[in-house]
């Protein structure tokens, strides 16, 4: 049987009754758009984070777009983020007319190197956008200190780190707003697309709710500020309500898979396993490892019917769609080096032990033969 980085069927078979009941609940409610399930999920997701406000949207990319717009970010502004991220992080900045500015990442944990932030803040900088990557939290203390010093907004990208903590603080609870994705692969994933923005600020939440609904305010069909059609689907919201109750269990399942990888692969020369940043409680959205012979390893593993991913093979600043930003080879040396060495092993809480052992045995054989 083929082995892939992620699949949902094991989880669905375990939770099928609850998932189908969620669908039935929505269909029987008579509310298909912005109904009880969306409102309840928003309340429960906000409460999970200890925050007063949550706005459900249609996907994680638009969570970032609406988050930026609600914080007043637009044309002429610069937003500082990383290039070692999923492209949608940067696409969202471009979508609001702002300019992405990149900072390099840490060699050890691949997170934003906050020690370099000051060097890229300029007169047009208006927002810092840290990405909590692969399941770990960025060190928010220097981010918040610089934001306060320079009067900048902070939008956290939490798409890959639901439930992650650093020094006890949940991701998404320290910035002016935080964007989440519920793409099916996520730690908290829907059975389709979904996203949300959480915030402690009532005015930001008011703007978000208008922006997700064409820009309409109190009067239906009257647009105050042109917005988007970006509503969280009612069925997905009800599924997410059920899954939110199991989020901590999903995280523990991922950590168990990670522990087995550490036991089975920790002694292999040249293979670098994830390093947990100081104070972090890793939730292992993906299990990213490094090896200088990455491409040879991936090719060899296909003979074992094991098909792995790279997160991410092309840094965003090297993509043709962002050539106008003027970055060149060597501008972000750590990011560029990592892109040639990292790859992801299968990681999801319903990964069967026999499937994981197959991966461990194959990786040991391939890496050991190099």
Curated annotation (Swiss-Prot):
Please give the superkingdom of this protein's source.
Bacteria
Record's keyword terms, sorted: Antibiotic biosynthesis, Cell membrane, DNA-binding, Membrane, Pyridoxal phosphate, Transcription, Transcription regulation, Two-component regulatory system
Give me the gene this protein comes from: dnrJ
Carrying N6-(pyridoxal phosphate)lysine, the residues are: 186
Compartment annotation: Cell membrane
* Major localization listed first in the record, in broad terms: membrane
Which Pfam family is an annotated match for this chain, by its short name?
Answer: DegT_DnrJ_EryC1
Q: Which GO terms describe its molecular function?
A: DNA binding; pyridoxal phosphate binding; transaminase activity
Name of the protein in its database record: Daunorubicin biosynthesis sensory transduction protein DnrJ
Q: Membrane topology for this entry?
A: Peripheral membrane protein
Q: Alphabetically, which GO biological process terms does the record hold? A: antibiotic biosynthetic process; phosphorelay signal transduction system; polysaccharide biosynthetic process
Gene3D superfamilies xrefs: Aspartate Aminotransferase, domain 1 (3.90.1150.10), Type I PLP-dependent aspartate aminotransferase-like (Major domain) (3.40.640.10)
What is the stated purpose of this protein?
Answer: May form, with DnrI, a two-component regulatory system for daunorubicin biosynthesis genes. This protein probably acts as a sensor protein.
Listed GO cellular component terms?
A: plasma membrane
State the CDD domains in the record.
AHBA_syn
Q: Which family does it belong to?
A: Belongs to the DegT/DnrJ/EryC1 family.
Q: What organism is this sequence from? A: Streptomyces peucetius
The record ties this protein, via InterPro entries, to: DegT/StrS_aminotransferase, PyrdxlP-dep_Trfase, PyrdxlP-dep_Trfase_major, PyrdxlP-dep_Trfase_small
Which stretches does the entry tag as region Hydrophobic? 53-158
Name the DNA-binding stretches: 160-179
């Amino acid at each position: 049987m083929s082995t892939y980085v992620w699949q949902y069927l094991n989880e669905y078979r375990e939770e099928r009754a609850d998932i189908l009941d969620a669908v039935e609940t929505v269909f029987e409610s008579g509310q298909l758009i912005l109904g009880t399930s969306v409102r309840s999920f928003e309340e429960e997701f906000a409460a999970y984070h200890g925050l007063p406000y949550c706005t459900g949207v249609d996907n994680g990319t638009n969570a970032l777009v609406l988050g930026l717009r609600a914080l007043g970010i637009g044309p002429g502004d610069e937003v500082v983020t990383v290039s070692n991220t999923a492209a949608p992080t940067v696409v969202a900045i471009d979508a609001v007319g702002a300019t992405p500015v990149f900072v390099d990442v840490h060699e050890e944990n691949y997170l934003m190197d906050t020690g370099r932030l000051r060097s890229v803040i300029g007169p047009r900088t208006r927002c810092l956008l840290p990405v909590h990557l692969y399941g770990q939290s960025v060190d928010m203390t220097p981010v918040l200190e610089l934001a306060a010093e320079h009067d900048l907004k902070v939008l956290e990208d939490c798409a890959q780190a639901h439930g992650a903590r650093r020094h006890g603080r949940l991701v998404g609870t320290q910035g002016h707003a935080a964007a989440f994705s519920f793409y099916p692969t996520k730690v908290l994933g829907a059975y389709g697309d979904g996203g949300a923005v959480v915030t402690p600020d009532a005015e930001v939440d008011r703007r978000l709710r208008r922006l997700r609904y064409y820009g309409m305010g109190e009067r239906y069909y009257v647009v105050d500020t042109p917005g988007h059609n970006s509503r969280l689907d009612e069925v997905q919201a009800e599924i997410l309500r059920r899954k939110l109750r199991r989020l901590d269990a999903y995280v523990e399942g991922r950590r168990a898979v990670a522990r087995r990888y550490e036991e089975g692969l920790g002694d292999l020369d040249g293979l670098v396993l994830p390093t947990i940043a100081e104070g972090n409680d890793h939730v292992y959205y993906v299990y990213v490892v490094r090896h200088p012979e990455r491409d040879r390893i991936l090719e060899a593993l296909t003979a074992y019917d094991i098909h792995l991913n790279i997160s991410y093979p092309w840094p965003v600043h090297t993509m043709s769609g962002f050539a106008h930003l003027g970055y060149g080879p060597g501008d972000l040396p750590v990011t560029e080096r990592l892109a040639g060495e990292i790859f992801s092993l299968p990681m999801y809480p319903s990964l069967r032990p026999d499937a994981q052992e197959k991966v461990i045995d194959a990786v040991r054989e391939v890496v050991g033969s190099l």
